[in-house]
Regions:
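CN hydrolase (nitrilase-like) catalytic-core segments centered on the catalytic cysteine
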Residues: 57-76, 148-229
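Short beta-strand scaffold segments in enzyme catalytic cores
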Residues: 77-79, 94-98, 130, 195, ...
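Cys-nucleophile CN-hydrolase/nitrilase-fold catalytic domain and related Cys-dependent amidase chemistry
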Residues: 15, 24-101, 106, 171-185
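Hydrophobic residues at beta-strand termini and immediately following loops
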Residues: 6, 108, 132, 196, ...
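Active-site catalytic loop in hydrolytic enzyme cores
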Residues: 87-159, 173-180, 243-250
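Short, acidic/polar
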Residues: 16-26, 148-154
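Binuclear metal-dependent phosphoesterase catalytic core
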Residues: 219-245
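Active-site-proximal beta-strand elements of phosphoester/diester hydrolases
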Residues: 1-10, 14, 107-109, 137-146, ...
Length: 257
C-alpha cells in the first residue's frame, strides 16, 4: 500500500480553494492508495465559527466520497463540520474522516479539544476511539492535541492498530514537541505513525509542517520539506511490523489500566 501525506498551505476559510488544491494532488498521485490531509484542511483552525462558515457533515462526506471514487484513492483528514445529529451542543465537531473508494465512510470526532485556543467553546468533543480496518491494515484516527495524551493513543487488545494517523495544525513554536511526540508514540506502541501538519499562516500562528511517516523503531520513513507545501510517500511493510512485534513483544507487558 502506498500512502501519501499532503503538507498543505491551507487557504483561510476558503473551502473551494482547498478542495481544488486537494484534487490537484490526487490528479498528480495516480498510484497512491491513501492520501492523508491536515487538520481542518478546508478552513484552517477556526475555533469559534460564525454562521455559514462551516459545511454540514453530509456535504463534506459527499465531496470526499466523490473524490475517493473518482481517483480510486482513500482520503483521511480533519474537517470542521456542523452536525445536527450530535446529542450535545454546540452541534459542531472537529471530525477526522477516513473515506474509501469502495464507499465506506468512517469518522472520529476529536476527543481532546484544545482548551488554550478556545476549541472547546466552538465544538463538542468525541468520546470514542476509532480504528479503521482497510485492505488488511488497522488505522487509529487521531487529531492534533490528542498526540499529547499517550493513554488515549495506547495500543491495547480492545483498540489494536498498525498505523496511528495524527492530522494537525501544530504551530511552529512547538515544533520540537511535535517531532518528539510522534516518535515517542511510534516507539511505545510498536506502530507506524503518520503525522500530517499544515504550513503557512493563520490569524494566530505560523506553521512549518514536519509532516512525516515514522517506523516503529522511531526513525523516519518519509518527510516533507520543512516550511514547503508538498507531498511525501511511503509503503508500510506489514510483514516486518508483525515480525518485530513477535520477536520483541513489549505490548504484551503493557499496563492494563
Amino acid at each position: 500500500m502506498k500512502i501519501s501525506l499532503f503538507q498543505q498551505d491551507i487557504a483561510w476559510l476558503d473551502p473551494n480553494a482547498n478542495y481544488q488544491k486537494i484534487e490537484r494532488v490526487l490528479q498528480d498521485s495516480p498510484d497512491t492508495d491513501l492520501l492523508v490531509l491536515p487538520e481542518m484542511c478546508t478552513t484552517g483552525f477556526i475555533t469559534l465559527p460564525g454562521e455559514g462558515q462551516l459545511e454540514s457533515a453530509a456535504a463534506v462526506e459527499q465531496k470526499l466520497l466523490a473524490l475517493a471514487q473518482k481517483y480510486g484513492t482513500a482520503l483521511c483528514g480533519s474537517f470542521a463540520v456542523n452536525d445536527d445529529t450530535l446529542p450535545s451542543t454546540p452541534q459542531r465537531a472537529n471530525r477526522c474522516y477516513f473515506v474509501t473508494p469502495e464507499g465506506d465512510i468512517h469518522h472520529y470526532d476529536k476527543h481532546h479539544l484544545y482548551t488554550p485556543g478556545g476549541e472547546g467553546l466552538g465544538y463538542s468533543a468525541g468520546h470514542d476511539k476509532v480504528m479503521v480496518l482497510w485492505r488488511g491494515i488497522r488505522f487509529l484516527l487521531t487529531v492534533c492535541y490528542d498526540l499529547r495524551f499517550p493513554l488515549w493513543l495506547r495500543y491495547d487488545h480492545e483498540h489494536p492498530y498498525d498505523i496511528l494517523i495524527c492530522v494537525a495544525n501544530w504551530p511552529e513554536q512547538r515544533q520540537l514537541a511535535w517531532d518528539t511526540l510522534l516518535r515517542a508514540r511510534a516507539i511505545e506502541n510498536q506502530s507506524f505513525v503518520i503525522g500530517v501538519n499544515r504550513i503557512g499562516q493563520d490569524q494566530m500562528c505560523s506553521y512549518q509542517g514536519g509532516t512525516c511517516a515514522i517506523h516503529p523503531y522511531g526513525h523516519y520513513l518519509a518527510q516533507c520539506t520543512l516550511g514547503q507545501e508538498g507531498v511525501c510517500s511511503f509503503e508500510p511493510d506489514m510483514q516486518k511490523l508483525n515480525e518485530f512485534r513477535q520477536k520483541f513483544p513489549v505490548l504484551s507487558d503493557a499496563d492494563v489500566d
